[in-house]
């Protein structure tokens, strides 16, 4: 027989409670209500092994609460330190809802004494790591942004379950704007947190991700409108958000039939700081465990491109991440025969063992123009909501202020309409490529998933493969050589060597193709252009350029750039190549030649205002300027 919420709380308040969770999820369960859960713990090896009961028709229910450690990203084939933190699954045996008011009347409120408070890395040590990442990783083209953690450590005197429940009570009373505020006790450890960020949720087949980035740290007296407006006008903060939106659009493009539809931006206000955020929605019918695997992990707490970020994290965090940047995922049955999913990223979370040792890991997004000491201060501020006494009064809030709303709306003035459209609007894009087959070769950057969505909107039939797969150009009308991290001159690297060989083959066979970013750089080298490392990398930068006579706003993510002093080259064995370039610096933006085109920027990015049109124009050029016999053989399959 199901027990009442009061009976479940009696069991939770015991000196040695069984595994339990109290979850405040106002966007899912409704404001003022918490989930009270009791269950049995298991340790599946992989996400696919999480045991789920059959769905049913009737009342919705919650089945499993999973705690997914960072090391689980190895399921995607990405590098990670194996710190042996287990994947934990609470099979829910009892569940009820309870109001905040009633719960607060039951929760203990004992004093919490912290001893031996310290960070594992000092501000100076953390700032030095930030400097190394900017110089050695972003500066070498490994990626656009990376998140490196540091950890606050302390011991709670006379620790017991009442200490953790009191800690949770304080967060519940004071923290504002969290997506989940929670306590999860597994038997051997307890997680207490106020995560601002949804990982992914699914209801009635609609999946939602919530990229959050940019941080305004409140001054001691609390936030004020002038500083909020300065924060919203800060290009660095805007760039950080655009980059993580691009990265989560890549994920949504992989799991959703129509890709993602972007909503926002908005101001997310919490007790001690504020962020900016977007929402991305898309329809999906895939197994929730598969969706969790495909979205390991959020770029807001790792970096981008994700695979490259994992390598960087492994280099700079040799001790592992445990559950920091992982997720808590709540899987259920929606009562209609389908699955429900809600999940929060495990940030702003205290990991407490049964002896009372507390670990709170935090990180900062490092981009090309990060100031190391500022990033150290930001990481410290992110821990403040958990380790400080919290303020007696809620801070002033400005999210609905007219000036703030106008400033937020202005951020969408020059970004891609495509990703702001819903799927029905995308179907109205002119599809004059209907039925043509295109092969996309992925070079370790899932921007290719976003390229695929735009190409399908143009009417193309798309196949995506990795550069490391066995594949053939035969049978395709077009080939797109994709972007990726790395130095295009390092031909001793297997991926770079493969791109050189593949692009030379496309040129010699005069097959129509488009090269993007890294592949554009390889093409430039194959055509004899000089390549230079940029003094300041373009990582998530929107620029206005002259693209073969048209003024375009486009998004760049590059450390290297081809150079040319001319707008046109005549190349033996190739023919005439047109060059779109910066007339002052000679930096090459794009190329057009017989049977091919290329672009240094990312037309698929949120930062490129007219991406599908630009891609369509370049593909038309490649097809139109391909010898008749090649077009005929492709079209006549």
From Swiss-Prot:
Pathway: Antibiotic biosynthesis; phenazine biosynthesis. It is an enzyme of class 4 (lyase). It comes from the Bacteria. The active site is at 517 (for gatase activity), 602 (for gatase activity), 604 (for gatase activity). Signal peptide: none annotated. SUPFAM superfamilies: ADC synthase (SSF56322), Class I glutamine amidotransferase-like (SSF52317). CDD domains: GATase1_Anthranilate_Synthase (cd01743). One of its GO terms (molecular function) is transferase activity. Residues 437-628 form the Glutamine amidotransferase type-1 domain. Disulfide bonds: none annotated. It catalyses: chorismate + L-glutamine = anthranilate + pyruvate + L-glutamate + H(+). Its EC number is 4.1.3.27. Keywords: Antibiotic biosynthesis, Glutamine amidotransferase, Lyase, Transferase, Virulence. Pfam families: Chorismate_bind, GATase. One of its GO terms (biological process) is L-tryptophan biosynthetic process. Residues 1-434 are annotated as: Anthranilate synthase component I. Gene3D superfamilies: 3.40.50.880, Anthranilate synthase. Involved in the biosynthesis of the antibiotic, phenazine, a nitrogen-containing heterocyclic molecule having important roles in virulence, competition and biological control. Component I catalyzes the formation of anthranilate using ammonia rather than glutamine, whereas component II provides glutamine amidotransferase activity. This is Anthranilate synthase, phenazine specific. The lineage of its organism: Bacteria, Pseudomonadati, Pseudomonadota, Gammaproteobacteria, Pseudomonadales. The gene is phzB.
């Amino acid at each position: 027989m199901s027990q009442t919420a009061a009976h479940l709380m009696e069991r939770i308040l015991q000196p040695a409670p069984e595994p339990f969770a109290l979850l405040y999820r106002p966007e899912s369960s409704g404001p003022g209500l918490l989930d009270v859960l009791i269950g049995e713990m298991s340790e599946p090896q992989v996400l696919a092994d999480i045991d789920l009961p059959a769905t049913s028709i009737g009342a919705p229910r919650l089945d499993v609460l999973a705690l997914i450690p960072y090391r689980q990203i190895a399921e995607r084939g990405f590098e990670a330190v194996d710190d042996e933190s287990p994947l934990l699954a609470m099979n829910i045996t009892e569940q009820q809802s309870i109001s905040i008011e009633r719960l607060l009347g039951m929760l203990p409120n004992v004093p919490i004494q912290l001893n031996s408070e310290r960070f594992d890395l000092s501000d100076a040590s953390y700032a030095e790591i930030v400097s190394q990442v900017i110089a050695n990783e972003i500066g070498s083209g490994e990626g656009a942004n990376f998140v490196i953690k540091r950890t606050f450590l302390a011991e709670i005197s006379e620790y017991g379950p009442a200490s953790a429940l009191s800690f949770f009570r304080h967060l519940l009373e004071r923290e504002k704007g969290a997506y989940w505020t929670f306590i999860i006790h597994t038997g051997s450890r307890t997680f207490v947190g106020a995560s601002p960020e949804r990982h992914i949720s699914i209801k009635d087949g609609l999946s939602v991700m919530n990229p959050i980035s940019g941080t305004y740290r409140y001054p001691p007296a609390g936030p004020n409108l002038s500083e909020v407006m300065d924060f919203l006008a800060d290009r660095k903060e805007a760039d950080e958000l655009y980059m993580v939106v691009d990265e989560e659009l890549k994920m949504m493009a992989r799991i959703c039939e129509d890709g993602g539809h972007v909503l926002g931006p908005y101001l997310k206000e919490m007790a001690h700081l504020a962020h900016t955020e977007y929402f991305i929605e898309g329809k999906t019918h895939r197994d929730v465990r598969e969706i969790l695997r495909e979205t390991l992990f959020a770029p807001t707490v790792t970096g981008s491109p994700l695979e490259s970020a994992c390598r960087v994290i492994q280099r700079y965090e040799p001790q592992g991440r445990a559950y920091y940047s992982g997720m808590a995922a709540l899987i259920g049955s929606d009562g209609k025969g389908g699955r429900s999913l809600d999940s929060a990223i495990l940030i702003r979370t205290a990991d407490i063992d049964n002896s009372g040792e507390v670990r709170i890991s935090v990180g900062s997004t490092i981009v090309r123009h990060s100031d190391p000491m500022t990033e150290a201060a930001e990481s410290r501020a992110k821990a403040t909501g958990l380790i400080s006494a919290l303020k007696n009064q809620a801070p002033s809030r400005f999210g609905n202020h007219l000036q703030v709303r106008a400033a937020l709306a202005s951020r969408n003035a020059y970004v891609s309409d495509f990703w702001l459209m819903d799927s029905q609007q995308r179907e109205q894009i002119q599809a004059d490529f209907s039925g043509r087959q295109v092969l996309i070769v992925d070079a370790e950057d899932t921007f290719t998933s976003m390229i695929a969505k735009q190409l399908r909107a143009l009417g193309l039939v798309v196949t995506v493969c990795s550069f490391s797969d066995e594949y053939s150009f035969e049978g395709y009308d077009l080939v797109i050589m994709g972007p990726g991290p790395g130095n295009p001159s390092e031909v001793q690297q297997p991926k770079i060597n493969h791109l050189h060989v593949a692009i030379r083959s496309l040129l010699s066979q005069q097959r129509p193709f488009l090269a993007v970013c890294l592949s554009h750089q390889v093409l430039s080298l194959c055509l004899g252009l000089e390549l230079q490392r940029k003094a300041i990398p373009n990582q998530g930068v929107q620029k206005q350029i002259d693209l073969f006579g048209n003024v375009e706003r486009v998004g760049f993510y590059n450390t290297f750039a081809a150079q040319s002093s001319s707008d046109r080259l005549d190349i033996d064995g190739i023919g005439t190549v047109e060059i779109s370039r910066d007339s002052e610096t000679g930096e090459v933006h794009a190329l057009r030649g017989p049977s091919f085109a290329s672009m240094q920027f990312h037309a698929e990015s949120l930062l490129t205002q007219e991406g599908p049109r630009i891609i369509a124009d370049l593909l038309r050029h490649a097809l139109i300027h391909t010898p008749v016999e090649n077009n005929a053989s492709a079209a006549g399959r």
